[in-house]
Amino acid sequence: MPQASKAFKPDGSGNWWIDEEQFAADFAADIPPEKAWFMAISQVPISTDSFTHKVTKPAWKTKPTWYMVAAADRSINPNQERMMAKRARAKTIEVNASHVAYISHPQEAAKLIEEAATFEAASTAQVNA
């Protein structure tokens, strides 16, 4: 699967953007074009620091984790997503979706979030009992 790295462009001030013309194909291929275009023109840049900052205490090492693999993602290779989910021992689901899987598959995303929230609520109740 080709990566979308050529669509990510630096702006010279330490931020990166996804090229508006390539946004739909590389980032949001499975949603209606008008929604992808709106996302492209309203995107918030990502800081270079996001790619280089070292995380010293990742939460996934000590907390339960859930992950939705986007099997048609062109921004993060789906095999990399699967590896990250496995490493985190995450409860994992997989959808045939682009990087914006939470938009193209809202029911699946909501169900996974509800499962995580229910698990956390039950865990908290046991601790407080």
Report each predicted region and the residues it spans.
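Flexible "cap/lid" loop of the alpha/beta hydrolase fold
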Residues: M1-E20, S47-S50, I76, M84, ...
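Helix-loop "lid/cap" segments that line or gate small-molecule binding pockets
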Residues: E21-D30
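Alpha-helical elements of Rossmann-like donor-binding domains used by nucleotide-donor carbohydrate transfer enzymes
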Residues: Q22, F38, Q80-M83, E108, ...
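Active-site nucleophile elbow and catalytic-triad environment of alpha/beta-hydrolase enzymes
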Residues: I41-A59
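Short, proline-enriched alpha-helix->beta-strand connector loops that line the catalytic pocket
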Residues: W60-T65, R87-K91
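Conserved strand-to-loop "acid loop" that flanks and positions the catalytic carboxylate
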Residues: P64-D73
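C-terminal and late-domain segments of enzyme folds
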Residues: R74-S75, E81-A90
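Catalytic active-site module of serine/aspartate enzymes centered on a nucleophile-bearing elbow/loop
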Residues: A90-A129
